[in-house]
Amino acid sequence: MIKLQKLKLYGFNNLTKSLSFCIYDICYANTNDSRNSYISYIDEQYNAIRLTKILKKTCSIIGANVLNIFHQDYEPQGASVTILVCEEPMSMEKIDALNKNIVSSSVLAHLDKSHICVHTYPESHPQSGICTFRADIEVSTCGIISPLNALNYLIHQLESDIVTIEYRVRGFTRDIHGIKHFIDHKINSIQNFMSDDIKSMYDMVDVNVYQENIFHTRMLLREFNLKNYLFNINLENLEKEERSYIKKLLSKEMREIYYGRNISR
């Protein structure tokens, strides 16, 4: 758990902390039917109900209280979940008042700043057989709640080939002497808050803007086992040349996503 510096604050902690994930799952399917089957499979694996369970557990880990949940599966594919959260428990009377358009100023502040959401994007290449699944997740909180406490849980739950993570702290809070504090904990890398087993699984690179309190980490899975990337294909049925071709194709796709640019070779 992240330990915040003990500052004597004047009023509410107005810092907004946002942790954003962009995760990718890659596979190879050599026919149109297989590609369609993969998209259907991954769409079911990451349906709105399962994603809601993951995000509710995230709320529990960071110590947030759920105000409202919206989830939706889409046709032909994709899902979205949004959870509005607050730092302190909210009485049922106040929550029910939202349905009558009676909203206090304190609740408005929470709804504006504290939320957890996820959106999914399955897709496939029209010719090569490459299929990708992307999920965008954002955990945004205000007050003493830190989204970094859910970092390892979310990485483990999503089991991705490529992950890009951004953590940023916005705004400021004042202490009792009126001095502004633009961040309330020590950090020089998102990797500071990752478990050792995650660090051993991924190659990682940081791009941080310290003066703006913006921290960015890219992650690429180290172990590559071709068998794990084939959908409805038996590895033993592939010739050596075909295995090599598919491996190069997948490697190129993963490197392009990891570096965020097209690679010619």
UniProtKB/Swiss-Prot annotation:
Marked site (Cleavage (non-hydrolytic)) residue numbers: K113, S114
Cofactor entry: pyruvate
Record note on cofactor: Binds 1 pyruvoyl group covalently per subunit.
Catalytic machinery residues: S114 (schiff-base intermediate with substrate), H119 (proton acceptor), C142 (proton donor)
Post-translational modification comment from the UniProt entry: Is synthesized initially as an inactive proenzyme. Formation of the active enzyme involves a self-maturation process in which the active site pyruvoyl group is generated from an internal serine residue via an autocatalytic post-translational modification. Two non-identical subunits are generated from the proenzyme in this reaction, and the pyruvate is formed at the N-terminus of the alpha chain, which is derived from the carboxyl end of the proenzyme.
Keywords: Autocatalytic cleavage, Decarboxylase, Lyase, Polyamine biosynthesis, Pyruvate, S-adenosyl-L-methionine, Schiff base, Spermidine biosynthesis, Zymogen
Molecular function terms, GO-annotated: adenosylmethionine decarboxylase activity
Cellular component aspect of the GO annotation: cytosol
Cross-referenced Pfam families: AdoMet_dc
Catalysed reactions listed for this entry: S-adenosyl-L-methionine + H(+) = S-adenosyl 3-(methylsulfanyl)propylamine + CO2
Enzyme class: lyase
Enzyme Commission designation: 4.1.1.50
Pathway participation: Amine and polyamine biosynthesis; S-adenosylmethioninamine biosynthesis; S-adenosylmethioninamine from S-adenosyl-L-methionine: step 1/1
Subunit structure: Heterooctamer of four alpha and four beta chains arranged as a tetramer of alpha/beta heterodimers.
NCBIfam families registered for this protein in UniProt: SAM_DCase_Eco (TIGR03331)
Similarity annotation: Belongs to the prokaryotic AdoMetDC family. Type 2 subfamily.
Protein name stated in the entry: S-adenosylmethionine decarboxylase proenzyme
